[in-house]
Amino acid sequence: MVAARVLALVVDQGRSLKTELAAALPTLEDVRDRALVEAICFAVLRRRPVYEAALTQWLARPLGRGDAQLRGLLMVGFAQLDVLKVPPYAALSATVDACRVLGWPHRASFVNAVLRRAQRERLPVVSSDAAWPRWLAERIRADWGELAEAIFDASLKPAPMWLRVNLRYGDRHTYVQRLQAAGLEAVPSGLVPEALALDCSMPVLQLPGFQAGEVSVQDLSAQQVAALLSPAPHARVLDACAAPGGKAAHLLERAPTLCLTALDVDMQRLRRVAETCDRIHVKARLCVADATDLAAWWDGEAFDAVLLDAPCSATGVVRRQPDVLLHRRAEDLLPLLNIQSRLLDACWRTLRPGGVLVYVTCSVLRAENQTQLEAFLARTVDACAEDPGDAYGQPAGLGRQRLPGEQGGDGFFYARLIKEI
């Protein structure tokens, strides 16, 4: 029932899945129920075109606009049978009971009949890009050719839960042993010394040492950013779009003496940076401002290193944010390109000669990545790009691109820029 309501808000009212889950899950007392609702919502959004095709084929009359919650409930039932492999009797019973709780006893037999058909028959087969808006799928194909299918396929699969071990409290091997003592298994990454991939997802607060700051949750691709920036101890560092704070926290875990300014335009999101810093026991200067408005926040003292994790289309993290494909519009792209360009220009002004600026996005669109970088270099005479290296993915112009799922990480673009002296 909770999952059906969340899905109706996300699919039919354009709400954020992350926001709606954050509001809905605390209403459930049992952590197992919370995990099930979250798993159902992600499964439905990843498999929504399949379930829509099934309803189109199986229903004599299509569901109307007023049936959003009923459609969501049917998809909840499909997901339990199709992805989560809940025993059929349990999936049918729970979904039919939800009809009665929602005040639809007259629809219980209808829901039961549809789910029994799903149990008997195969669900329709749809193309791997069926969930992607046509304009976006066409752009992915134009950018990536034969690799487009791999992007679409990877975006349908659940993302692994990556952990970042805080090496100030102990080494990675010791933390793996703690996980094993708790009945959990994890695989170390060869790319980042702090990174571990859990064999299954779990509630963050149940991770050993999480609340004490001994471990954090952060995707592998995001964890690689700290080494690419690699500021010296005591350096002045700017994280220009800092929220929710994972990259700033990682930098400070590695070098607690950094003088790091965490900047974000959103006060609520910046509070999350503060909470993260408090949890891992590091200090940062927090500033609420638009990074492009230098007069509003910058004191004129240059930074040694700047991290610009720019707002983007999020096309590299669809496996973690499947509702991106519901909400992203073609007209969103140009404003994003404009703000990325303005952020690059503004942040560059704050960087000292000889300093390093790292530009990253969680996008796989060339317009936001190598094309954006090439345009910046063309208009910025004192900027030069250094190749991040093979550990950061395949060459993408003067940067590097990891596609979703490669080496277990999210889709990410990386560029390392040096300000000439």
UniProtKB/Swiss-Prot annotation:
Main EC class of this protein? transferase
Top-rank taxon: Bacteria
Q: Identify the PROSITE patterns for this entry.
A: NOL1_NOP2_SUN, SAM_MT_RSMB_NOP
Query: An example Gene Ontology cellular component term from the record?
Result: cytosol
Catalysed reactions, as listed in the record: cytidine(967) in 16S rRNA + S-adenosyl-L-methionine = 5-methylcytidine(967) in 16S rRNA + S-adenosyl-L-homocysteine + H(+)
Q: Do the record's keywords include Cell division? A: no
Q: Which Gene3D superfamilies match?
A: NusB-like, Sun protein, domain 3, Vaccinia Virus protein VP39
Q: Where is this chain's protein located in or outside the cell?
A: Cytoplasm
Provide the active-site residues from the annotation.
Answer: C362 (nucleophile)
Write out the entry's keywords from A to Z: Cytoplasm, Methyltransferase, Ribosome biogenesis, RNA-binding, rRNA processing, S-adenosyl-L-methionine, Transferase
Q: Which GO terms describe its molecular function?
A: RNA binding; rRNA (cytosine-C5-)-methyltransferase activity
Q: Which GO terms describe its biological process?
A: regulation of DNA-templated transcription; rRNA base methylation
The family database entries (InterPro entries) matched by this protein are listed as:
MeTrfase_RsmB-F_NOP2_cat, MeTrfase_RsmB-F_NOP2_dom, NusB-like_sf, NusB_RsmB_TIM44, RCMT, rRNA_ssu_MeTfrase_B, RsmB-like_ferredoxin, RsmB/NOL1/NOP2-like_CS
Q: What does this protein do?
A: Specifically methylates the cytosine at position 967 (m5C967) of 16S rRNA.
Q: Which family does it belong to?
A: Belongs to the class I-like SAM-binding methyltransferase superfamily. RsmB/NOP family.
Protein name stated in the entry: Ribosomal RNA small subunit methyltransferase B
Gene name tied to this protein:
rsmB
